[in-house]
Amino acid sequence: MVVLGSTGSIGKNALKIAKKFGVEIEALSCGKNIALINEQIQVFKPKKVAVLDPNDLNNLEPLGAEVFVGLEGIDAMIEECASNLVLNAIVGVAGLRASFKSLQRNKKLALANKESLVSAGHLLDISQITPIDSEHFGLWALLQNKTLKPKSLIISASGGAFRDTPLELIAIQNAQNALKHPNWSMGSKITIDSASMVNKLFEILETYWLFGASLKIDALIERSSIVHALVEFEDNSVIAHLASADMKLPISYAINPKLASLNASIKPLDLYALSAIKFEPISMERYTLWRYKDLLLENPKLGVVLNASNEVAMKKFLNQEIAFGGFIQIISQALELYAKKSFKFSTLDEVLELDKEVRDRFKNYR
């Protein structure tokens, strides 16, 4: 298999599962963590390696692997790889081209790059995609019973770092505080997206593309991150998917469903500890961006605007140029600006053109 973004949280766990399942790693790519990819090269001995920045080539130790550089290099690497499975864990819209290239080459796509579906779900062959996400894995598992007819799909949110912060103090919070997730430790982007509830807006759009636009789609807060998804059926019964909060579960099924079903990758649940489970609505007063949920479901191509404005805001927030209130304001202004526009793009280039337009419009925000 090919692992793109092998030095991130998803990539590292994917390599653990691949090793456990005896899956050969043909190719790896990374962003900036050259020291770690050098270690991975020693262990997995890939035939091909890609790095984003040519300035990192001097520190790369490929051990005879063919080396590719930049996003174009990743495309070329995918083109040349014989593997049938590509796991895309690149962060941000930078991973979009890799998703397209993988599907163009008729490869199965294990997709952790949310931005691919959020920005261009209408252009991707969903039948070849397995999402690497606890919530969507939960929905997939719940929908395997074809006798029951689903009515609504519900995914859970932890509430993020500011779920108990006094409302009047949320706007002045900085990135350091946003990165203090109460339940888990992952990358900075997804942790901040959890605090803003953008991550759940992304997952709502992913659910739309993956499981069908005809069903009602919603989310709720479940603080323990044990209930990942629920499905309500036409008979008014509801089934929930519970599991330890560990990404190795969806990763293992994306790599090899048969082996995953026979080999546990996560800890068993302590059922006696489940009495604390409680469901809460997502408050629009606390999570002001949640008010755009219905707008995005009505016009899912707005996902391009959501993602582009979020990446602009994220960079400014992490660079301490703006506080959390400014972060929210950039995304709100972008969605309000484009809310009534009709998008008819049918190519990747058109998606990237709108992405660039949104970034250019908000890059000088202060």
Curated annotation (Swiss-Prot):
This is 1-deoxy-D-xylulose 5-phosphate reductoisomerase. Signal peptide: none annotated. Keywords: Isoprene biosynthesis, Manganese, Metal-binding, NADP, Oxidoreductase. The keyword Manganese applies. Belongs to the DXR family. It catalyses: 2-C-methyl-D-erythritol 4-phosphate + NADP(+) = 1-deoxy-D-xylulose 5-phosphate + NADPH + H(+). The keyword Manganese applies. Its EC number is 1.1.1.267. GO terms for molecular function: 1-deoxy-D-xylulose-5-phosphate reductoisomerase activity; manganese ion binding; NADPH binding. It is an enzyme of class 1 (oxidoreductase). InterPro entries: DXP_reductoisomerase (IPR003821), DXP_reductoisomerase_C (IPR013644), DXP_reductoisomerase_N (IPR013512), DXPR_C (IPR026877), DXPR_C_sf (IPR036169), NAD(P)-bd_dom_sf (IPR036291). PANTHER family: 1-DEOXY-D-XYLULOSE 5-PHOSPHATE REDUCTOISOMERASE, 1-DEOXY-D-XYLULOSE 5-PHOSPHATE REDUCTOISOMERASE, CHLOROPLASTIC. 1-deoxy-D-xylulose 5-phosphate binds at residues 114, 134-135, 158, 181, 194, 199-200, 203. It comes from Helicobacter pylori (strain G27). Transmembrane segments: none annotated. Mn(2+) binds at residues 133, 135, 203. NADPH binds at residues 7-10, 31-33, 113, 115, 187. Its cofactor is Mg(2+); Mn(2+). It holds the Pfam family DXP_reductoisom. Catalyzes the NADPH-dependent rearrangement and reduction of 1-deoxy-D-xylulose-5-phosphate (DXP) to 2-C-methyl-D-erythritol 4-phosphate (MEP).
